[in-house]
Curated annotation (Swiss-Prot):
GO CC list: cytosol
One of the GO biological process terms: prolyl-tRNA aminoacylation
Organism encoding this protein: Staphylococcus aureus (strain NCTC 8325 / PS 47)
CDD domains for the chain: ProRS-INS (cd04334), ProRS_anticodon_short (cd00861), ProRS_core_prok (cd00779)
Similarity comment text for this entry: Belongs to the class-II aminoacyl-tRNA synthetase family. ProS type 1 subfamily.
Enzyme class: ligase
Protein name as annotated: Proline--tRNA ligase
Keyword Cytoplasm: yes
Domain remarks: Consists of three domains: the N-terminal catalytic domain, the editing domain and the C-terminal anticodon-binding domain.
Length: 567
């Protein structure tokens, strides 16, 4: 394709709010154009990359007998009300009304709709298992879209749904999909790691995320260097081994702590280590207030709280709620209280006595507080995030951290949707059973961004061969010169029969062409320049920067060999 005919609006400067390198490079190289916050158009080069990604996805889905369909993005509210997610999903669900006042949602996911499609069709165990997938735009009303395609309000996704007669069948499809995802991310050029994860609003009993390792990743991965252990930090279990630091029990004292609001400020004020401070936070669980205690250097993990209490209806109490409940602001909270409120403490609080806690009065704290004498703990549990260097639950070693971008996730849904939506089949005994389900997602547009995040240098993108928008970049330095133009035209005609070629025939300065070529990042470059009359051209590899002069008689052999050896 001739570059003069392709819409590639490269940029010299990018908006300052473009923080991620992938966001900056996708804008700068003319692959995407922002419409408004979190919404982008995919321009010709990006569309070609997306087509290459989706071709790989389709191949791997068909390899495991997953069948492609296409469902509407617009979904009626009644389906979401059946599953209970219309109210539970929250403000991220984009809702709208038609002219008749009927409620709809622009789908962020399609569990309800696909269940409604199959519930009157998959009637017998003989029709199972069945796996359906689609590739489609999804919508989520992100509060703060950021990092370009990594967290947008409209995004492209591959979502698949499987239906089974028994758990063994689900386990097999889950494993097949897990392996397919591993192959997909390897083929598109992403270093992705599967990690144990939380199922979030989708639900289900078991899930893995596929994380593309990246410094700008919004998720923290906990992993072992001694085993295959890897988990999202939200799910990483903290191993409790008692390490009591008990001292002689001291009398309770109330002390003035002016302008002290955080655990670290309190530790500094008292001249004590922050891990000897105990923080108190108030949560509302299914409408009931509870207190949760952790040591000063630990952070409460609300995902673990949701798992512990078996509900998603958990939220941190607001400042007004806290003041109305205990008469003090959040920085002064403590468990010594004359109100009926259940108290839960992280396991590691047990290691301390003579605690330092808030006095439930602004500007004051209590020291030498002791469990049993001054307050009681209803239950202890693992309520916090793991720290780097702590022991891992598989016994393999200690926790190491890395950042990652979630590019895919697989779920075992069980009967969460089929039971609520009455999707049943007859088993081999003729009894009605709820369909057992799995769901599996890949962020296609997010994968595009993750590829760029992992494959770039200071000059631009470095596309992996499998997804590159074109194989070769043919550049005529000065098309006004007959020998250069004629040779470049001839090479374009020859190589275009075997490779996808982007032919830069523009009337631009050589520096502009070379800068754009580096920015766009095609794997191989052929430059027709001053030695065109001798039949000599330059061949350059984008990844290594290696270049050599080659006679046109040898050019096809050289290019073919180099292309075959590309990653």
């Amino acid at each position: 394709m001739k570059q003069s005919k392709v819409f590639i609006p490269t940029m010299r400067d990018v908006p300052s709010e473009a923080e991620a390198q992938s966001h900056r490079l996708l804008l700068k190289s003319g692959l995407i154009k922002q419409s408004t916050s979190g919404i982008y158009s995919y321009l010709p080069l990006a569309t070609r990359v997306l087509n290459n990604i989706t071709a790989i996805v389709r191949q791997e889905m068909e390899r495991i007998d997953s069948v492609e369909i296409l469902m509407p993005a617009l979904q009626q509210a009644e389906l979401w009300e059946e599953s209970g997610r219309w109210g539970a999903y929250g403000p991220e669900l984009m809702r709208l009304q038609d002219r008749h006042g009927r409620q709809f949602a622009l789908g962020p996911t399609h569990e309800e709709l696909v269940t409604s499609i199959v519930r009157n069709e998959l009637k017998s165990y003989k029709q199972l298992p069945m796996t359906l997938f689609q590739i489609q735009s999804k919508f989520r009303d992100e509060k703060r879209p950021r990092f370009g395609l990594l967290r947008g309000r409209e995004f492209i996704m591959k979502d698949a749904y499987s239906f089974h007669a028994d758990e063994a069948s689900l386990d097999q499809t889950y494993q097949d999909m897990y392996q397919a995802y591993s192959r997909i991310f390897e083929r598109v050029g992403i270093n992705a790691r599967p990690v144990v994860a939380d199922s979030g609003a989708i639900g289900g009993s078991h899930t893995h995320e596929f994380m593309a390792l990246s410094a700008i990743g919004e998720d923290t991965i906990v992993y072992s260097k001694e085993s295959d252990y890897a988990a999202n930090i939200e799910k990483a279990e903290v191993v409790y081994e008692p390490n009591h630091k008990h001292t002689t029990v001291q009398p309770l004292e109330k002390i003035e702590t002016p302008n002290v609001k955080t655990a670290q400020e309190l530790a500094d004020f008292l001249g004590r280590p922050v891990d000897e401070i105990v923080k108190t936070m108030i949560f509302k669980v299914d409408g009931e207030y509870i207190m949760v205690l952790v040591r000063g250097h630990h952070e409460i993990n609300d995902i673990k709280l949701k798992s512990y209490f078996g509900t998603d209806n958990i939220e941190l109490a607001t400042q007004d709620e806290i003041v109305n409940l205990v008469g003090a602001n959040p920085g002064s909270l403590g468990p010594v209280i004359d109100k009926e409120i259940k108290i839960y403490a992280d396991n590691f609080v047990q290691d301390l006595n003579n605690l330092v806690v808030g006095a439930n009065e602004d500007g004051y704290h209590l020291i030498n507080v002791n469990v049993g004498r001054d307050f009681n703990v209803d239950e202890y549990g693992d309520f916090r995030f793991i720290l780097e260097g702590e022991k891992l639950s598989d016994g393999s070693g200690v926790a190491h951290f890395a950042e990652g971008i979630e590019v895919g996730q697989v779920f075992k849904l069980g009967t969460k949707y089929s039971e609520s939506m009455n999707a049943t089949f007859l088993d081999n005994q003729g009894k009605a059973q709820s369909l057992i389900m799995g769901c599996y997602g890949i962020g296609i547009s997010r994968t595009l961004s993750a590829i760029v995040e992992q494959n770039h240098d200071d000059n631009g993108i470095v596309w992996p061969k499998s997804v590159t928008p074109f194989d070769l970049h043919l550049i005529s330095i000065n098309p006004k010169k007959d020998d250069q133009r004629e040779l470049a035209d001839a090479l374009y005609a020859e190589f275009n029969t075997k490779f996808d070629v982007l032919y830069d025939d523009r009337q631009e300065r050589a520096g502009v062409k070379f800068n754009d070529a580096d920015l766009i990042g095609l794997p191989l470059r052929i430059v027709v320049g001053k030695r065109a009359s001798e039949g000599i051209v330059e061949v350059k590899e984008r990844l290594t920067g290696d270049s050599e002069e080659v006679h046109i008689d040898d050019l096809m052999t050289v290019i073919t060999n180099k292309y075959d050896n590309l990653k």
